[in-house]
Design a protein with these regions (language model features):
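Conserved small/polar residues in nucleotide/adenosyl-binding loops
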Residues: 286-291
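Catalytic core of DAGKc-family lipid kinases
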Residues: 113-194
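A conserved acidic, glycine/proline-rich C-terminal tail/linker
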Residues: 243-282
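A short, gly/pro- and small-residue-rich
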Residues: 99-112
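Short gly/pro/ser/thr-enriched loop/turn and capping motifs at secondary-structure boundaries
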Residues: 95, 113-118, 238-239
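Short glycine/serine/threonine-rich phosphate/pyrophosphate-binding segments
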Residues: 94-98, 205-208
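ATP/NTP phosphate-donor binding region
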Residues: 1-89, 120-143, 157-159
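Gly/Ser/Thr-rich active-site loops/lids in small-molecule metabolic enzymes
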Residues: 188-239
Length: 293
């Protein structure tokens, strides 16, 4: 007998909740914000909208389904199951945060603050939850399959991300490494920089886009479902032993970007989740082969 679907509601602690937890009471939090020229009512109203959205989406889950909730900070300890339907209630970045822990489960994104969030990944309003949840397993329902980026270390540690993967020193200080493209005639360059970003078309709406735009890059950014990645070296430093000729490019199909670590304390993390970083000691390969996640 197959298990009934389980709706996993993914949410994030609101700014209001964080403020009250830090300062102890609503009044103390209000005083703290007031001393910085802010009004707590604006923060509290966003909190109330988020809680209302979460309650509305939760109430729309079919009665025959199981359901549970997980906060963003607990994602790395949560065990997702094959029959799960992941329901993200919050900001676009929350979809990217949860994607790395999934293996083909469908994801629905609901925007708690339309107009404030771009709505690239949380495209739906809570009022549409009942209809969307009922149609998840209906044959013919349109689904967007998004490309992901994968990094594999020489010790077989693997990291997958929906937006981008960053390699660099803890604290974003100078990172030293050798960078090269597999199958590019053996061209390898020693570099010192503040890190390397490799991202997808989904990531092209966030951190990756800011680097691309600031440089006025001629590279065409990929679409979210396109099997192509783009990469950028941040602030490469020219010196007698380090170069700046390989600072951006694209990875198409099975193309691989290879980095060999030459300084201590380098880490790699995905989608801004620094707390889930992997420490590197030797080599790292970037590829877009993780698109089937």
């Amino acid at each position: 007998v197959s298990l009934a679907p389980r709706a996993v509601l993914v949410h994030r602690t609101t700014e209001y909740e964080e403020l009250v937890a830090r300062h102890g009471t609503h009044g103390q939090a209000a005083y703290f914000l007031r001393s910085r020229g802010r009004d707590i009512e604006e923060v509290a109203e966003r909190h109330r909208r988020t809680r209302r959205a979460l309650a509305e989406v939760s109430a729309a889950i079919p009665l025959t389904w199981r359901q549970t909730q997980v906060e963003r900070g607990d994602l790395d300890r949560f065990l997702f199951a094959p029959e799960d339907v992941v329901v993200v209630v919050g900001q676009d970045g929350l979809v990217a945060n949860v994607a790395k822990y999934l293996a083909g489960q469908p994801v629905l994104g609901f925007d708690t603050d339309p107009g404030r969030n771009p709505g690239v990944l949380v495209r739906h309003r809570p009022a549409a939850a009942a209809t969307l949840l009922r149609s998840v397993h209906v044959v013919g329902t349109g689904v967007d399959e998004l490309t992901m980026v994968e990094a594999v270390a020489d010790d077989t540690q693997r990291l997958v991300a929906l937006n981008e993967i960053y390699l660099g020193a803890v604290g974003h200080q100078t990172a030293r490494y050798r960078l090269g493209l597999e199958g590019d005639g053996g061209v390898v360059e020693a570099q010192a920089s503040s890190g390397v970003l490799v991202g997808t078309g989904t990531g092209a709406t966030g951190w990756l886009r800011s680097v691309w735009q600031e440089r006025g890059s001629a590279l065409a950014l990929p679409h979210p479902s396109e099997g192509r990645l783009v990469w950028f070296v941040r602030e490469a430093w020219p010196s007698p032993v380090t170069g700046t000729s390989l600072v951006s490019g694209e990875l198409v199909g099975a193309a691989v970007l290879e980095l060999t670590v030459e300084s201590e304390g380098l880490v790699v993390f995905g989608d801004g989740m620094e707390g889930d970083a992997v420490e590197l000691t030797c080599c790292l390969l970037y590829t877009s082969d993780a698109a089937d996640e």
